[in-house]
Amino acid sequence: MIEDREVQQLFGDDLEFSVPEGIDFISTNPRVHTASVLARHRTSGIVHVDDTLNVVKIPPILRRFLPSPQLTFHPLLGKALQKNADAADRYIRWASGLARQWRDTPVVCAAHSDIHHLQGTDFQEEVLQALEGVRKTLERHRLRYAAH
């Protein structure tokens, strides 16, 4: 499986991989498929992602009034976080590190949503903005499991 380091090494000359931390890669709930292996083509910098990141599509009629497409984290993130006190912090560290490490990404191909050309913004900025969008979810999770 691609989430295994040995398999990733087979493609290491061409691709970089990242697996989210703090969430269950395979959830016991079949509706929750928030984790995925993110792959970045080394030469082009293009990121391919299944479920972890989504692209919010703006209908053409609304593009004059709403911000351009942007990255968001999967809406079921809260259900995918591991049931322990440090899961939210581990997810934040992973996402922040990914944003910094892959900041020069020009395009994100997000399965089930859209292809996002990062123009006028950058990957780091959008991932950090997406992280801000799930801040309450992460804080609720942290508080819920802090006492356990």
State where each predicted segment sits.
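Metallo-beta-lactamase
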Residues: 1-146
